[in-house]
Amino acid sequence: MATFHFDLVSPEKIAFSGEVDQVDVPGQEGDFGVLAGHAPFVATLRPGILTVTTGGTQQKIIVLGGLAEISEKGLTILADVATSLKELDQTAFATEISGMEAKLNEKQGDELDRAIERLDHFKTIQQQLNTTALH
C-alpha cells in the first residue's frame, strides 16, 4: 500500500508526524478517510477519534476540533486538542462531560445549540472509549 506524510499538530505538541497508510478523520460534515493520492481539500473537524493506520497497526487519537488540509504533500491536521488513548485520563474526561451538562442551563439560543452539539460529540467519544474495540 502506498504511504503519505501525515502531521498532527496541537498548540501543546506535535502529536504525530510520519509516513502512514491511511487516516480516518472525524469531519464536521462527516467522517472521511485519507489514502495516498487523495484529492486536495480543506475540512473542519468535530470532536472525535482519529484513526491512524501504519503497517497494519492502528493508533487512536482523540481530537477536539480543528482543521484538516490535504495537499500533494500529504495530510496536515491542526487540532484544538490531540490526545492519544494512552495519554487520556478517562476520569477527567468524564468530569469534563459532567461540567458541560451542568452549564447547559446557563446558555440560550445558538450558544445552547452549540453546547449541546459539543456535549453530544464528547458523549459519543466516551461511548466509543467504553467499547472493547478501542482497547
From Swiss-Prot:
InterPro entries (alphabetical): ATP_synth_F1_dsu/esu, ATP_synth_F1_dsu/esu_N, ATPsynth_dsu/esu_N
Cellular localisation: Cell inner membrane
Keywords: ATP synthesis, Cell inner membrane, Cell membrane, CF(1), Hydrogen ion transport, Ion transport, Membrane, Transport
UniProt keyword Acyltransferase present: no
Predominant location category: membrane
Pfam family, one: ATP-synt_DE_N
Keyword Cytoplasm annotated: no
Similarity-based family: Belongs to the ATPase epsilon chain family.
Function: Produces ATP from ADP in the presence of a proton gradient across the membrane.
Self-association state and partner proteins as the record states: F-type ATPases have 2 components, CF(1) - the catalytic core - and CF(0) - the membrane proton channel. CF(1) has five subunits: alpha(3), beta(3), gamma(1), delta(1), epsilon(1). CF(0) has three main subunits: a, b and c.
Protein name (record): ATP synthase epsilon chain
Organism field: Bradyrhizobium sp. (strain ORS 278)
Gene for this chain: atpC
